[in-house]
């Protein structure tokens, strides 16, 4: 088996992206600085623009370069959290500590009211869609251990978004690699009861399934179910010099879905595509190098 390698590029996002060849990246998992939350003390940084519109425009510019380096059948997983409009002071990050002496402030952006939720993730998602990206999914990252908030007039924020974006309508996505455990006992008892009295739910379910072999023909109970769009993943502490680290358990399913565990073909660059048996619709573990949806990129060790 070929040894996995990786390369770390440090610097301005656009400048570093420009060093990569066209259509050379298989999958992108990214979480850019959120709008109006923190000053990292870097000139020209993303996140401290005067208005949400300027912030969105900056990200659209970055993602145009992402689109250039992404393979035509590649995927992007974009994590973004929201912000609230307020007169505030930003904390300036200084390695592991926050230098509160260098704080500076910002006012409520034009067009918004104090305490408005700004809807930044969706502003970015729609702008990228308008710029030519396919917006395929809005994954909810549910945090069972969210940061405490002192508010008493709204619920505590306990989720962020992970948008799945693509360059085309067809792309590489390994659904088998990220299947989740199926809980089907309730469905089985409700729709496949052996008792004499069949409920209306039984009949409706059978009618809905039609010629697809009933609900059993639509579901693969033995091998799990297609991953849902709400991912419950706890935040994790990090001792390094960073204040907003994505949990590895959030990154892992993105990489597994967007890349092939067997790598890619050395001749054509296509990934090894998983082949499913038609009889059971279950993955066999076999792979095909001539996949119509193919991607290439760097494999992260341990994922």
Residues covered by each model-derived region:
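Core catalytic lobe of class I
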Residues: 2-303
């Amino acid at each position: 088996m070929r040894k996995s390698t990786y390369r770390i590029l440090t610097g301005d996002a656009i400048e570093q992206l420009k060093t990569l060849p066209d259509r050379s990246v298989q999958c992108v998992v990214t979480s850019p600085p959120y709008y109006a939350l923190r000053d990292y003390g870097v000139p020209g940084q993303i996140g401290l623009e005067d208005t949400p519109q300027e912030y969105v425009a900056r990200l659209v510019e970055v993602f145009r370069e992402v689109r250039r380096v992404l393979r035509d059948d590649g995927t992007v997983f974009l994590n973004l959290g929201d912000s609230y409009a307020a007169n505030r002071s930003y904390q300036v990050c200084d390695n592991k500590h926050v230098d509160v002496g260098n704080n500076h402030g910002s006012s409520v952006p034009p067009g918004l009211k104090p305490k408005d939720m700004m809807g930044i993730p969706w502003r970015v998602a729609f702008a990228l869609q308008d710029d030519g990206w396919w917006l395929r999914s809005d994954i909810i990252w549910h945090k069972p251990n969210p940061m405490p908030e002192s508010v008493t007039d709204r619920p505590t924020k306990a989720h962020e978004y992970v948008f799945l974006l693509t360059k085309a309508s067809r792309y590489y996505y390994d659904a088998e690699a990220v299947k989740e455990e199926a809980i089907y006992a309730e469905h089985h008892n409700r729709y496949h009861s052996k008792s004499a009295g069949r409920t209306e739910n039984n009949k409706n379910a059978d009618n809905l399934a039609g010629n697809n072999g009933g609900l059993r023909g639509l579901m693969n109970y033995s091998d799990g179910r297609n991953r849902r769009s709400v991912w419950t993943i706890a935040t994790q502490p990090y001792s390094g010099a960073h204040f907003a680290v994505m949990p590895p358990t959030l990154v892992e399913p993105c990489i597994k879905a967007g890349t092939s565990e067997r790598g890619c073909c050395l001749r054509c660059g296509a990934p090894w595509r998983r082949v499913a048996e038609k009889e059971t619709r279950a993955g066999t573990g076999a792979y095909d190098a001539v996949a119509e949806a193919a991607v290439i990129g760097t494999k992260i060790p341990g994922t």
